[in-house]
Amino acid sequence: MNDNIFCDNIDQIDLNTLQQLQGWQARYKQIVVWGKLLTAKPELRRDNYRVRGCETAAWLTHRKTLGGHEFALDADSKIIRGLAALLLKKIQHKTSAELKQLNIDALLIELDLKSHLSPSRSNGFLALAKQALALALDQH
């Protein structure tokens, strides 16, 4: 697989910005904007990379590096792409020990997303997160 799929520029994502925005519509728009930071990855769109439990089509792969873990994500839905970008911000280049400490439910609450996301979007985000963590932490 091409190394370029692991090179999304998520440096612009600042979770504090999201927390400071007033109102769900402003947050939703910001999440969609951040989703545009993820480049399209046609080579990732294969069944073996498909995220199970996500209502919209989403794909995920992983590789372990000397410094931690790298993930590549893609999705058809704008909001799921944005949520994937948020997830990447939290997990990209983290060590296994750091990933083990990550509490996805707490992240949804911290960003005030849990009460605003529909059940299907919330489930999609959780499916992405669980599959990412499983890929990283099941490495031998």
Language-model features: where?
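N-terminal intrinsically disordered, cationic/polar leader segments
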Residues: N4-E55, K64-G67, A72, L108-H140
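Generic structural signal for well-ordered secondary structure
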Residues: V51-G53, I80-R81, K100
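Glycine-rich phosphate/pyrophosphate-binding loops
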Residues: K94-I109
